[in-house]
């Protein structure tokens, strides 16, 4: 018989895979209660509210039916955890008291409809408020010493586009090749803290952008160690890191006429055992959040989706590290 007590390491697995059955609903309720307690919402949202207030845009929700920004951001979190479309989220908020409690709504309060959720997503994507949200939360993690900054591990993942290449519906997606296979879509780039596995930085691009092009924007150049796979191998890059006193843990790359030495292979194996930690956020996004491909047809909204998944992953790390 399964216990109702949540194993915090698997908290999001329990919540995201709840299938809306009665037993797991109890775990989901507990999961949402823990999230509510762990985050300083006022501090998180203040800079975002200031940006929205200062920005005068034709597509702003102002003047239409509006909701507290806290409710909207929590709606985005629910969508990421439970893999819900806008219409399905509206239905579940109306049906599930645990969702209403998480959002701070009474049973008599109006709930955000699918149009409202969509409008706010457009606002966040157009103003890059998803990035602001992510980095404001990371400030809280830094204050808690969960972003240590001694070591950084960099990697990227390919996300298949929602549109087919032949449809020409997605103007931002593009092609790339990996291990001889062609992909059409985007890339999500991350840098994690090597000690806590918290995602420190995020970038999002079309798939044609080489992983290494995002390298400089993902590192701080104040860390002691940087690790990355051989796709980032570049002699000038290695020299730059070493000149700053940073240990270069970029895996060596072999070439057709210059294979790796035994020493280099051994070094790669040792570095890989540490570097592999960067695969865990991507695995979490795919296996737990069911984020296996893009949902939208442009880079702004697909970036928003990726960064929200990274944000939820960091919430999960906060809970795991503080329990």
What is the predicted function of each stretch?
Residues 1-46, 321:
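Charged, often Cys/His-bearing segments associated with DNA-binding zinc-finger transcription factors
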Residues 300-302, 307-323:
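Charge-patterned, long linear interaction tracts outside catalytic cores
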Residues 224-225, 230-300:
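Helix-centered, glycine/charged polyanion-binding patches within enzymatic domains
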Residues 97-107:
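Short, basic interhelical loop/turn and adjoining N-cap
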Residues 61-70, 180, 297-304:
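Structural motif
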Residues 32-77, 81:
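Basic, short loop/linker segments at the boundary and entry of helix-turn-helix/winged-helix-like folds
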Residues 87, 91-94, 104, 112-247, ...:
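Polybasic low-complexity intrinsically disordered regions
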């Amino acid at each position: 018989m399964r216990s109702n007590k949540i194993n915090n390491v698997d908290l999001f697995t329990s919540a995201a895979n709840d299938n809306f059955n009665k037993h797991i609903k109890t775990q989901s309720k507990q999961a949402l209660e823990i999230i509510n307690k762990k985050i300083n919402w006022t501090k998180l949202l203040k800079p975002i509210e200031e940006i929205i207030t200062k920005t005068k845009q034709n597509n702003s929700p102002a003047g239409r039916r509006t909701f507290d920004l806290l409710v909207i951001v929590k709606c985005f979190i629910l969508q990421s955890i439970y893999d819900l479309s806008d219409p399905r989220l509206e239905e579940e908020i109306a049906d599930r008291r645990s969702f209403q409690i998480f959002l701070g709504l009474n049973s008599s309060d109006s709930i955000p409809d699918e149009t409202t959720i969509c409008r706010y997503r457009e606002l966040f994507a157009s103003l890059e408020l998803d990035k602001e949200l992510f980095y404001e939360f990371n400030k809280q993690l830094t204050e808690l010493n969960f972003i240590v900054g001694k070591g950084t591990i960099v990697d990227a993942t390919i996300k298949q586009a929602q549109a087919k290449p032949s449809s020409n519906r997605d103007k931002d997606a593009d092609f790339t090749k990996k291990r001889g296979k062609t992909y059409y879509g985007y890339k999500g780039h991350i840098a994690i803290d090597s000690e806590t596995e918290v995602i420190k930085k995020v970038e999002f691009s079309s798939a044609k952008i080489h992983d290494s092009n995002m390298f400089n924007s993902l590192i701080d150049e104040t860390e002691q160690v940087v690790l990355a796979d051989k796709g980032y191998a570049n002699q000038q890059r290695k020299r730059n890191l070493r000149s700053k006193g940073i240990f270069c843990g970029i895996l060596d790359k072999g070439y057709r006429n210059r294979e790796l030495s035994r020493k280099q292979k051994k070094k790669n194996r040792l570095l890989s055992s540490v570097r592999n930690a960067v695969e865990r956020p991507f695995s979490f996004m795919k296996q737990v959040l069911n984020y296996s491909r893009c949902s939208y047809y442009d880079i702004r909204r697909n970036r928003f989706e990726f960064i929200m998944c990274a944000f939820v992953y960091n919430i999960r790390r906060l809970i795991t590290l503080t329990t």
